[in-house]
Amino acid sequence: MESFKYCFDNDGKKWIIGNTLYSGNSILYKVRKNFTSSFYNYVMKIDHKSHKPLLSEIRFYISVLDPLTIDNWTRERGIKYLAIPDLYGIGETDDYMFFVIKNLGRVFAPKDTESVFEACVTMINTLEFIHSRGFTHGKIEPRNILIRNKRLSLIDYSRTNKLYKSGNSHIDYNEDMITSGNINYMCVDNHLGATVSRRGDLEMLGYCMIEWFGGKLPWKNESSIKVIKQKKEYKKFIATFFEDCFPEGNEPLELVRYIELVYTLDYSQTPNYDRLRRLFIQD
């Protein structure tokens, strides 16, 4: 007879723990709700209580990604959904804490242009909501954008940043942060040690879009010093950037315009989300 490991969340729900999905700073497990089901439809993220990013992620889910607020926001705008996971459980032991979300599928790898356009709109909507709540995501990269049953999900809220100081003034641009993340998709501000602002989230999304549309990031496999140097140069010469991303000259004009608009944003500027979104809405 198979034996099961399990734990209880703060609401008393029992979660049966399956195989490890990922082991890094935090550990991800497949989990399920009961013994009768053989399907592990959920994922548990667990880490030591001393690891602050997981605590920050849990707090972000509770205080910012409130389901009722999301529902009201989407209904007011006529949006089908936001790429934000639902939280199904939070728990802790003497030494560890965890949260549970649905198994959200695989990394988004578009099969056609239509799905790319839809993904671009959904992600712009999602970032607009997060920004409207006074935060940035800070870690937009392909592995954090999943798809299941044609529904996207943006995961990993461990590096979110507050946009405003006390008094509702925008945070200042200061190059005093220790950078972290995937250098291929990192925004220039983050490379330089500044907190990711709204333009940074949208810039990182742009690098994901380039690959979704079949392009390549010219700085891949380069050192971090070369990566930031190239990104800074490409911001000055966008035409050259797209020649290197799409050597066959098949870059979508909508994507070029998106990058142009994002690259011209000031650090504290509120993006024109409608203008960005309309680039990818197909009639």
Curated annotation (Swiss-Prot):
PROSITE patterns: PROTEIN_KINASE_DOM. Its main location: host cell. GO terms for cellular component: host cell nucleus. One of its GO terms (molecular function) is ATP binding. Keywords: ATP-binding, Early protein, Host nucleus, Nucleotide-binding. It is found in: Host nucleus. The keyword Nucleotide-binding applies. It comes from the Viruses. Residues 1-283 form the Protein kinase domain. Both catalytically active kinases B1/VPK1 and host VRK2 repress B12 inhibitory activity in a B1/VPK1 deletion mutant strain. The keyword Nucleotide-binding applies. Interacts with B1/VPK1. Interacts with host VRK1. Interacts with host VRK2. Pseudokinase that plays a role in viral DNA replication repression by activating the antiviral protein BANF1 and inhibiting the activity of host VRK1, a cellular modulator of BANF1. Belongs to the protein kinase superfamily. Ser/Thr protein kinase family. Poxviruses subfamily. This is Pseudokinase OPG198. The gene is OPG198.
